Design a protein with these regions (language model features):
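Acidic, S/T/G-rich, low-cysteine, solvent-exposed domains in lumenal/extracellular/periplasmic regions
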Residues: 1-180
Length: 180
């Protein structure tokens, strides 16, 4: 009823929640991938995804247009899943707002504990390095109101830890994400 009336939402998903979340997200035309993302890094554990703003997100707000590219901001997303958009027409306009690098990031299908385990992309297991979407903005017009929904493939990105943590080597855009 809330969605049908045009209510706005910020939906935060996480690894291991696909079974619960995918039936709900399918009503919005979004799907969580089955396995979590891994990112190769000499400095951080493989479960830490450093997502960047997409070019498409620049049309949404000033911060995505100016701050994210100007300062090369990244949103730290520990334990993140990729999101995909269906081809079905649900009446929404879909804008990918956060994405991974094209190199060094893949959906890890073999290992589940990515905290400390070294992992590498295994093409024979169906793993592929490419750009993955980690957050979408959905919008649609309902009568005289615009409905807005943000869906993120990680809930920890807005936790107190990720909002305040400073890691060497990149500038955090986590706080910028929630104020946009």
């Amino acid at each position: 009823a809330y969605l049908a009336r045009g209510g706005n939402l910020f939906i935060l998903t996480d690894t291991g929640r696909q079974e619960v979340m995918n039936p709900f997200l399918s009503k919005l035309g979004i799907k969580m991938e089955e396995y979590q993302l891994a990112q190769s890094s000499a400095d951080f554990s493989p479960n830490l995804i450093l997502a960047k703003a997409t070019r498409e997100s620049e049309k949404l707000t000033f911060g995505f247009k100016d701050d994210f590219p100007k300062y090369d901001l990244r949103v730290s997303m520990p334990g993140c899943v990729a999101l995909t958009c269906s081809d079905n027409d649900y009446g929404f306009q879909y804008t990918p707002i956060l994405e991974t690098n094209a190199k060094g990031v893949w959906i890890e299908k073999e290992q589940t504990d990515l905290q400390e385990s070294p992992v590498e992309c295994n093409a024979s297991a169906g793993e592929k390095e490419q750009t993955y979407i980690t957050a979408y903005a959905l919008s649609r017009q309902l009568k005289d109101k615009e409905q807005r929904i943000i869906i993120s493939g990680d809930a920890d990105c807005i936790s107190n830890t990720e909002l305040t943590l400073s890691r060497e080597g990149y500038r955090s855009g986590n706080f910028n994400l929630i104020i946009e």
